[in-house]
Design a protein with these regions (language model features):
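A secondary-structure micro-motif
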Residues: 3, 19, 24, 34-226
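N-terminal membrane-targeting segments
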Residues: 1-6, 10-12, 17
Length: 226
């Protein structure tokens, strides 16, 4: 009987050890996938300098509509820096401390961005009624030739006030004509999982930096011509 009990204890110890090893492998695999996704996202936007950050807190609720990251002014983070995760745009930095920053996501109902499809500009906004579906709303789309359809890719526009150009927001999931017969509204499915965010990439240049650089380049070109 004692021998059987001893064997059982040994088997239990082996099972516990294997379970621990298996959990470690799962964690390692999850971490590898996360790092691979971050790398792929970084490679999508090589034209912009970026820094990785970890989310350290969020507002109450299921959604990451406002959250805090572990990077701040000491890392080059500034207000209005754009933030990425998964496969697209997450939001924008609204407040910065030395070693932290607050991000307001695009699903927040106070957020809006000028965006562009392959056909025309429109305004994308957070919508509380659409959050549970992982969707955003868009409006002010002038699509006179009816070319914008479900599945259309939406990115930030060069005329957006605070978002740099070309950041992926999502795909059109619905589009309908307004009663004025001039503009259209609809919804967009975002590629970002706003319920399970953990890490983000922060673009460390602002839209205004790009505007200033373009203005300076234009001035230099004019001076050279003279």
């Amino acid at each position: 009987k004692e021998e059987i009990l001893s064997e059982n204890e040994n088997l239990k110890a082996q099972i516990d050890s294997l379970t621990e090893q298996n959990n470690k492998l799962i964690q390692d695999q999850t971490e590898y996938v996360r790092l691979q996704q971050m790398y792929n996202l970084d490679q999508q936007y090589t034209e912009y300098p970026k820094i990785a950050a970890e989310i350290i807190s969020k507002d109450p609720g299921n959604w990451y509509d406002t959250f805090m990251i572990n990077r701040g002014s000491a890392d080059g983070i500034r207000v209005d820096n754009n933030v990425l995760a998964d496969k697209g745009l997450v939001g924008i930095v609204t407040e910065v401390g030395t070693h932290w920053a607050t991000v307001r996501s695009i699903i927040d109902d106070s957020s809006s961005a000028m965006t562009v499809s392959t056909q025309d500009n429109c305004v994308v906004e957070g919508d509380l009624e659409l959050i549970d579906e992982g969707k955003l709303s868009f409006s002010q789309l002038y699509d006179q030739n009816n070319k914008v359809t479900v599945g259309e890719r939406i990115v930030t526009s060069n005329i957006s006030e605070k978002y740099v150009e070309g950041l992926f927001i999502g795909y059109v999931s619905e589009v309908e004509q307004n009663s004025n017969n001039l503009t259209k509204t609809g919804t967009i499915v975002t590629p970002v999982d706003f319920q399970h965010l953990k890490n983000v990439l922060v673009i460390t240049v602002n839209k205004q930096d790009s505007v200033n650089d373009n203005a300076q380049a234009a001035q230099e070109a004019t001076a050279n011509e003279e």
